[in-house]
Amino acid sequence: MSHIKFWRQTLALVILSTLLSACGVNNLPTYDEQVKSSWSQVENQYQRRADLIPNLVSTVKGYAAHEKETLTEVTNARAKVGSIQVSKNLLENPQAMQQFQQAQGELGSALKRLLVVSERYPDLKANQNFLALQSQLEGTENRISVARRDFITATQRYNTEIRTFPGKLWHSFLYSDMKLREAYTATTEDAATAPKVTF
């Protein structure tokens, strides 16, 4: 009799563990790692952009020395981005994340102004080094956009898992230390307003 009881318990345990593994008990840690990984890609692309800036500024400076204000803006924006401590805790701190996003937005705006200024200098636009840097910067901006999109998608998947069944159940029992992630906004406040174009 006890032999049958043992096999029933063993069978119940095997069935229960199979059901648990099939119904999403590991989704939250998996999605959390995807959020962290996708954020690392965003950081990598931001670093790539920051690494291009000194060469770009030096090249423009040689041709447009009297555009000192714009060059200073770009340099200061890069310094501001560099002064923000980026760590794994940035994802856990919405205020620090907001500061980081704002600094990156300011840097992006300063770079756009620099490229607009460069349009006034035909010799600069013909410089092969400048053209190569401009192309690399454009490619990096595209990579940043893709990395942001992937991060937003991973964050949404993670947050949805915490808010819906059965993820909500697993969250309350096993992963209560995992918090909802702050929604990432990759746009500036004025992005919703269409720019005026006049000819």
What do the PLM-derived regions correspond to, one by one?
Residues 2-199:
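A helix-centric hydrophobic-segment signal that preferentially recognizes long
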